[in-house]
UniProtKB/Swiss-Prot annotation:
GO CC annotations, alphabetized: plasma membrane
Protein name: UPF0382 membrane protein SAB0533
Domain of life: Bacteria
Source species taxonomy: Bacteria, Bacillati, Bacillota, Bacilli, Bacillales
Organism (species): Staphylococcus aureus (strain bovine RF122 / ET3-1)
Claim: Cell membrane is one of the keywords in the record: yes
Length: 122
């Protein structure tokens, strides 16, 4: 599905941008702890952006579970990385409670991809 390729490319691109912003724009302006949180958000966004690219490539040849995997991983990026970015910029700690929702969405997305693989392989 072209949409997942676009979403994957956009997320990978944004991860490069947020990584550069963290390294050059935030360093020295926030604590090392928050800089580490920012880096984790960037890393997970990149990994899962690449996953969306792969899902986009294979989604036309497999089951609906691949599409579910893509949407769950995309939502995971928003909840996980998005909440961490906002947490770092605002330092509103309650936003950290949203982050695990993104982690769970990532995990379910990966499980759906595994299920799709078994269904496709027969």
């Amino acid at each position: 599905m072209k949409l997942f390729i676009i979403l994957g490319a956009l997320n990978a691109m944004m991860a490069v941008g947020t990584g550069a912003f963290g390294a050059h724009g935030l360093q020295g302006k926030i604590s090392d702890h928050y800089l580490s949180v920012w880096e984790k958000a960037t890393t997970y966004q990149m990994y899962h952006g690449l996953a969306l690219l792969i899902i986009g490539v294979i989604s036309g040849t497999t089951s609906i579970n691949v599409n579910w995997a893509g949407w769950l991983i995309f939502a995971g990026i928003i909840f996980f990385s998005g909440s961490l970015y906002i947490l770092v910029l605002t330092q509103i700690k309650v936003l950290g409670t949203i982050t695990p929702i993104g982690g769970v969405l990532f995990i379910i997305g990966w499980i759906m991809l595994i299920i799709a693989t078994f269904k496709f392989a027969g």
